[in-house]
């Protein structure tokens, strides 16, 4: 479930939360939990360290609220640079709007292949677990939009690439999980 925190950059106070998901009850539960914290002036750190009940077979120890706070922290610290879903969708509809962009898809090759077939030179596929050995193949003259399902692997790839001096990267905020739910026309069939 994609969640987005609205935060004050200076005080790091959380001002709001929005999100969506296939079943609204999960989103509603997070918004209800967040509402109480926001009313008390909670900061990013309060959300990041929030303890919520979970059952391992059904959810993760790191809740979506924690993850959203960690993303906000990484954005404010400059450790994460991203392109919005809206800007990415505009580029997919009209590539001439950002001819310097190229998608770097780090998902499994079976997921990537239809995009390589359809979009050719606008799309590059390097599996997440191969980026460390293949990063020298990346074009230096392109703004690389790193794509995965939820932006988690994109962030990790971006962090690694930063460490080796490749900084012409942006992660796709929300990842393909969000785009898949939007039902876009350009998705390969």
Regions found by a protein language model. Name each.
Residues 104:
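Active-site flanking residues adjacent to catalytic metal/cofactor-binding acidic residues
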Residues 1-78:
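Flexible, glycine-rich terminal cap/loop adjacent to redox cofactors
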Residues 45-56, 60-62, 66-101, 109-145, ...:
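Rhodanese-like catalytic fold shared by cysteine-dependent sulfurtransferases
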């Amino acid at each position: 479930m994609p969640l987005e925190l609205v935060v004050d950059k200076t005080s790091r106070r959380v001002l709001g939360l929005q999100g969506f998901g296939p079943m609204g009850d999960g989103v509603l539960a997070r918004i209800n939990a967040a509402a109480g914290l926001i009313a008390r002036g909670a900061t990013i750190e309060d959300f990041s360290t929030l303890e919520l009940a979970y059952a391992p077979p059904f959810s993760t120890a790191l809740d979506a609220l924690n993850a959203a706070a960690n993303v906000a922290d990484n954005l404010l610290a400059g450790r994460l640079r991203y392109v919005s879903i809206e800007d990415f969708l505009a580029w997919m509809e009209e590539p001439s709007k950002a001819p310097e962009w190229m998608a770097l898809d780090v998902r499994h090759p079976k997921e990537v292949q239809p995009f390589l077939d359809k979009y050719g030179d606008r799309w590059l596929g390097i599996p997440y677990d191969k980026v460390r050995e293949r990063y020298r193949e990346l074009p230096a003259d392109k703004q690389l939009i790193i794509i995965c399902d939820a932006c988690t692997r994109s962030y990790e790839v971006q962090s690694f690439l930063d460490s080796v001096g490749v900084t012409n990267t942006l992660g796709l905020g929300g990842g393909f999980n969000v785009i898949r739910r939007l039902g876009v026309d350009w998705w390969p069939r």
